[in-house]
Amino acid sequence: MLSPKKTKFRKEHRGRMKGRSSRGSRISFGKYALQALEPAWLTSRQIEAGRRAMTRNVRRGGKIWVRIFPDKPVTVKPTQTRMGSGKGSPEYWVAVVKPGRILYEMGGVAENIARKAIEIAASKMPIRTQFIISK
């Protein structure tokens, strides 16, 4: 599971996901990619599940790049706790994904293999995505 080694602050505001992704929306490493079409928080578990699915599908061939990193802590209060008495403790990490963001890239394999592997990874994601090919 991905998580930052060290952060400046333990807890963060939730924030908003307005507009499209300004950075990380072009293919820069591989030839094929999975692009987000909706805004969402992707947990480190979801990112890892997608990566494992792709790796398992291409077996020994090709290279995979994970283009997102979960750097936002999500806090959760214990169950049966009354309101107030501060913010909960950090439970898991999420990556804030806006529409247009590249999630995974792949290279060194045939298009049909890449398409199959990326579609399996896409099924693990909680958002609509699309398969794209670099020009």
UniProtKB/Swiss-Prot annotation:
InterPro entries: Ribosomal_uL16, Ribosomal_uL16_bact-type, Ribosomal_uL16_CS, Ribosomal_uL16_dom, Ribosomal_uL16_sf. GO terms for molecular function: rRNA binding; structural constituent of ribosome. Residues 1-23 have a biased composition (Basic residues). Disulfide bonds: none annotated. The keyword Ribosomal protein applies. PROSITE patterns: RIBOSOMAL_L16_1, RIBOSOMAL_L16_2. It is found in: Plastid, Chloroplast. One of its GO terms (biological process) is mitochondrial translation. Residues 1-24 are annotated as: Disordered. The keyword Chloroplast applies. It comes from the Eukaryota. SUPFAM superfamilies: Ribosomal protein L16p/L10e. Gene3D superfamilies: Ribosomal protein L10e/L16 (3.90.1170.10). Keywords: Chloroplast, Plastid, Ribonucleoprotein, Ribosomal protein. GO terms for cellular component: chloroplast; mitochondrial large ribosomal subunit. Belongs to the universal ribosomal protein uL16 family. Part of the 50S ribosomal subunit. This is Large ribosomal subunit protein uL16c. It comes from Pelargonium hortorum. The lineage of its organism: Eukaryota, Viridiplantae, Streptophyta, Embryophyta, Tracheophyta.
